[in-house]
């Protein structure tokens, strides 16, 4: 019996794969407006500071393909096909949807490599994919909207924090800062759950890791006239030091799932500059990347959606 094909649309932000690609990437983020030479060189300088280019492209591809392999191992009666769709670099989300259509995929599951729902992120990604799929007559896309409280995701970070605390002598003098990418404040007024979801993630991880000293912060805010959600992690570090005299700061950028510019520069460089100024210790646990525990977490999330689809088909077939 021929296996039914299921498209697995894995979506992410995207990143330039070489310094020569930075200008086109930056221009796409700015909706087609080229950045100033000063802004462009500033961004290129950040990439050079982390070794020349971000490892994100390689990690994202590895995450997508390993997740697809896991799904094929879990659901042997189906054939999952991997399609990578990126927001700001090729292959774009639309490229992936068109490829699924050409391949004869009639049904797909989409997952965004970001745990917290926002109109700026997960909603926007899924809307782009579904809008085009409806325009071209398929495939039918079943989106996963959020997974910020997935137990295996919580366990991953709790384990990382526990391991980090083994390196800290005075645990009462240490604090964990859970962070995500800042977004414009206007999303809060519109009822976006992004902030509440980050807080919930932090609370769940803190409980699982049995820590009391923790808070949430925001990082990597855009340079626009609109106010962005705060406090920024660097300002927060200084405030926490002034108030509590913490001697160790543990940064957990749980809004991200891989090492990339925002982690390797904004955390590992900029936040460390602050902790060095304060004569405090800097720690940043390992990111999930394509570790087997995290791939298993993603597979669990996708399998829940797949089981919903299978159950729905059984109901339809029995009626």
UniProtKB/Swiss-Prot annotation:
Gene3D superfamilies: 3.40.50.1400. GO terms for biological process: heme biosynthetic process. Fe-coproporphyrin III binds at residues 13, 30, 46-47, 54, 125. Transmembrane segments: none annotated. Pathway: Porphyrin-containing compound metabolism; protoheme biosynthesis. Fe(2+) binds at residues 181, 262. Pfam families: Ferrochelatase (PF00762). It catalyses: Fe-coproporphyrin III + 2 H(+) = coproporphyrin III + Fe(2+). Keywords: Cytoplasm, Heme biosynthesis, Iron, Lyase, Metal-binding, Porphyrin biosynthesis. PROSITE patterns: FERROCHELATASE. One of its GO terms (molecular function) is metal ion binding. InterPro entries: Ferrochelatase (IPR001015), Ferrochelatase_AS (IPR019772), Ferrochelatase_C (IPR033644), Ferrochelatase_N (IPR033659). It is found in: Cytoplasm. GO terms for cellular component: cytoplasm. Disulfide bonds: none annotated. Its EC number is 4.99.1.9. Its main location: cytoplasm. Involved in coproporphyrin-dependent heme b biosynthesis. Catalyzes the insertion of ferrous iron into coproporphyrin III to form Fe-coproporphyrin III. Belongs to the ferrochelatase family. This is Coproporphyrin III ferrochelatase 2. The gene is cpfC2.
């Amino acid at each position: 019996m021929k296996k039914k094909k299921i498209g697995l649309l894995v979506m992410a932000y995207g990143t330039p794969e070489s310094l020569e690609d930075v200008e086109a990437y930056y221009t796409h983020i700015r909706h087609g407006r080229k950045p100033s030479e000063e802004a462009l060189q500033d961004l290129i300088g950040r990439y050079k500071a982390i070794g020349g280019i971000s490892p994100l492209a390689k990690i994202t591809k590895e995450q997508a393909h390993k997740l697809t392999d896991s799904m094929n191992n879990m659901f042997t009666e189906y054939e999952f096909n991997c399609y990578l769709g990126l927001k700001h670099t090729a292959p774009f989300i639309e490229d992936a949807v068109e490829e699924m259509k050409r391949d004869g995929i009639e049904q797909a599951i989409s997952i965004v490599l970001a745990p917290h729902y926002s109109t700026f992120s997960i909603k926007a990604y899924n809307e782009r994919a579904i809008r085009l799929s409806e325009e071209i007559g398929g495939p039918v896309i079943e989106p996963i909207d959020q997974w910020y409280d997935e137990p295996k995701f919580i366990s991953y970070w709790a384990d990382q924090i526990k391991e980090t605390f083994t390196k800290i002598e005075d645990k009462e003098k240490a604090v964990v800062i859970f962070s995500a990418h800042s977004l414009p404040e206007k999303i809060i007024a519109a009822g976006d759950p992004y902030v509440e979801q980050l807080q919930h993630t932090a609370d769940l991880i803190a409980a699982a890791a049995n820590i009391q000293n923790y808070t949430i912060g925001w990082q990597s805010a855009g340079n626009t006239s609109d106010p962005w959600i705060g406090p920024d992690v660097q300002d927060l570090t200084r405030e926490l030091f002034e108030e509590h005299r913490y001697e160790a700061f543990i940064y957990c950028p749980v809004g991200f799932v891989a090492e990339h510019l925002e982690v390797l520069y904004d955390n590992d460089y900029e936040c460390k500059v602050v902790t060095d100024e304060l004569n405090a210790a800097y720690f940043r646990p390992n990111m999930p990347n394509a570790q087997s525990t995290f791939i298993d977490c993603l597979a669990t999330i996708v399998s829940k959606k797949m089981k919903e689809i299978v159950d729905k088909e059984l109901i339809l077939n029995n009626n």
